[in-house]
């Protein structure tokens, strides 16, 4: 016997998306993940180059949850696992980033956080897991759900930089 469960459908979009395409897509989504915010080496938030407020408004007008997507993109718009490493091993940077995220989400009206860190180093696996737990706890206290984007994994012992730094369990 199969149990019915509602599906949550997320869509990622850059703030420079054509507004007509966004409006056509929103009725099919549960959440709109605005792509993306990055961060600096010292833990400051890097917003998208194009204003994202209009997307948040469109999402809410269509009963879709707008989510801030935090990536490991650096100031050159490249995924940077050294940036992740530096963040994960510095309490002050983590606190600065979490504080900045909470402020940005409150100010702009985001209703959730999607974490999309690419290329977490294998040696950072446990530190990343602790960071996700801490970030989730802080966000949940403020009423924000947190999701983590993951590369598809086909086995427990799968090798590769997309998998080894992530504790899928």
Where on the chain are the PLM-derived regions?
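Chitinase-like catalytic core of GlcNAc-active glycosidases
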Residues: 2-16, 26, 39-169
């Amino acid at each position: 016997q199969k149990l019915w469960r509602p599906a949550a459908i997320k869509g990622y979009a850059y703030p420079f998306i054509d507004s007509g395409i966004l409006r056509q897509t929103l009725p099919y989504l549960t959440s709109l993940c605005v792509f993306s915010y990055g961060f600096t080496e010292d833990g400051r938030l890097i917003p998208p180059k194009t204003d994202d407020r209009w997307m948040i408004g469109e999402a809410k007008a269509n009963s879709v949850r707008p989510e801030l997507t935090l990536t490991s993109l650096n100031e050159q718009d490249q995924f940077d696992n050294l940036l992740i490493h530096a963040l994960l091993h510095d309490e002050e940077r983590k606190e600065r980033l979490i504080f900045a995220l909470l402020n940005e989400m409150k100010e702009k009206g985001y209703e959730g956080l999607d974490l999309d860190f690419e290329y977490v180093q294998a040696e950072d696996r446990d530190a990343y897991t602790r960071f996700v737990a801490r970030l989730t706890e802080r966000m949940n206290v403020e009423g924000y759900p947190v999701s983590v984007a993951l590369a598809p994994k086909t086995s427990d012992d799968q090798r590769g930089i997309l998998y080894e730094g992530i504790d899928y369990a």
